[in-house]
């Protein structure tokens, strides 16, 4: 379990380190757009905006890092194949082994990571639950395709696993957040 939790330390530090710079960079455009749309800026809007920036920064760092130090050597050594079988994690529940805890935690964290997106969709856009469902699925698909393509060709191979179950759990997490 500690190994699983340790895998979050570098992305967490990266996102928290990068967040203040993004806030400074995006504050003026956010305030200008808010003034144009609503003609006022409230503290709750500022707090919500900074929280959203932190969420999306964290999402990027958690889903795309760590990156391989030597991409060419990584690609020659590892051949990551997409996991395209929906609900294959059920086998680990029915027949537990040494990976069951890790896989369970990964599924739970995928749901947890997308709950804030659903909350954001409901609070900011005031749309129907179908909007949250579609948004969660599309953002999750963007992340998975980014992982599958090695950040759209920046890396010579896929260095993260494309997993169809991530699409399912992330979309569910977004919908759950919308329902809260």
Where would I find each of the regions flagged by the language model?
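Individual transmembrane alpha-helices with interfacial aromatic-anchor signatures
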Residues: 159-172
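Bulky hydrophobic segments
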Residues: 1-159, 175-180
